[in-house]
């Protein structure tokens, strides 16, 4: 199994090969996911909810992400490792550079930021200085209070066009990957077709180049609200590694996400 890079994912896109991503926060789970063939691992600020017990992702700090990035890095050999930049850690280009450097030194191969046009300067700056960027559009959880909750984005024509325009602009600024979350499947398809960089979906239909889920949802250990776009693979397989393989297989075959996991 060869090491996954952003170039690998571009090749997958060109060949029409679907790829998979999961969140990970420690060496043991990361090692299991890596060895079973998960292409991308994200040290997500979702840890604020699934690990720390908060109601949203806002309390997560750069130190939190850096610590868990170091843990995950020690457990993997092949997967591309992305680290989330948490709330208010990239409000200015200067702040972005300092905090992104911290996460790269902790072992990340790429950093992820949430937002559109206001991030273009920072994305270009990071890229020019050797820090790869994954952008994130649609439902951006750090903006949950602006949205008035965890709501599907891009359902009306104006917002759909805005998200598409932002996706193109972020690619032009140098973003190497894009995550789209909780947007209509038709919009996700249009974005995927419009960009040359790989697009990873979560709650965005089956036409994106890859899929990502939170590991706690895949393993059925999330408490409280269970997102519509998630699927408990452990329930159908009974074993963690088998659950991961089932997720990989269903994405590759176009079975997941199904209509029941998709927004229109």
From Swiss-Prot:
Gene3D superfamilies: Phosphoenolpyruvate-binding domains (3.20.20.60). Keywords: Cytoplasm, Magnesium, Metal-binding, Pantothenate biosynthesis, Transferase. Pathway: Cofactor biosynthesis; (R)-pantothenate biosynthesis; (R)-pantoate from 3-methyl-2-oxobutanoate: step 1/2. GO terms for biological process: pantothenate biosynthetic process. It holds the Pfam family Pantoate_transf. Its cofactor is Mg(2+). 3-methyl-2-oxobutanoate binds at residues 45-46, 84, 112. Mg(2+) binds at residues 45, 84, 114. Its EC number is 2.1.2.11. Homodecamer; pentamer of dimers. Catalyzes the reversible reaction in which hydroxymethyl group from 5,10-methylenetetrahydrofolate is transferred onto alpha-ketoisovalerate to form ketopantoate. This is 3-methyl-2-oxobutanoate hydroxymethyltransferase.
